[in-house]
Amino acid sequence: MGMLVKSWEEGFMKFQPGVHFEYDMYGTASAMGALYTGKGDIAILGQEIYPFEVKAFEQERHYPPTEIQLATGSVDVRNFDYALGPFVNADNPLQKLSLDQLDKVFAYHDDPKDNILTWDQLGLTGPEWEGKPIHLYGWYESDIFSTWIERAAMHGSHRWRCGMKQYAHIHRPDGSIYDSGQQILDDLSHDRYGMGLSNVRYLKGTNTRPLLLARQPNGPYYAATKETLINRQYPLTRVIPAEIDRAPGQPVDPAVREFLLYLLSRDGQQEIVRNGKYLPIQPEAAAREREKLQ
């Protein structure tokens, strides 16, 4: 994120050479605090804002922050909000899921009718699938990936299914990291009755494949690709926002407004493409975000 922000600054200064930037890149966790305490003008986040961050801002300022979407999460670039999704063993015939089914598979619900526990409940037939339990693979419940899935697919619930095998990064003695997403797909490779949450960057060398995903029960279904992420068709698309402090009925600070308009311009979005990590947003989406700054 730091390199992208620096390139945005340099690009903006070509049009506004007198502008001066001061920034502290301590990470997403500190950005909102700097905004609502008046230490910063713009909080550019590396992930979607958390509800507790909105609440903290509201407690201090008595109104919510204004969000401007700047970029789209990556397909498979580590640490750049890559697209999450469900995976199965390559020997499993299941091809697709809806978000509602994903919720019913991974989340626990009080009503038994809202829990999907076996493969026949997902439409698989035959003695090798009927009545066979779905084995779940995912991150620890406190992981930021789990937290985001709770918001995006589980209606904010924190109640994961009991028995899910949970993973965290493993730090090896040589300094390398065995990513949790890789561990999930490695273990799923040996379990034809398993379903896991991960990312396509970890597919190579495993006996697994991703499922198509739909927002609605009857589709349309999508894989996570650059096109489907930029177009917001893939249901678990990640969004990279900037948050600003704009009091109700008041204009955006002129300097903040001009900088954000630059980020949403063709030149600003092209910097995202050149950076090669995050993805840009659609021109139509950029136009909608610019409207928020009026």
Language model segments and positions:
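Flexible loop/hinge segments at secondary-structure junctions
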Residues: 1-294
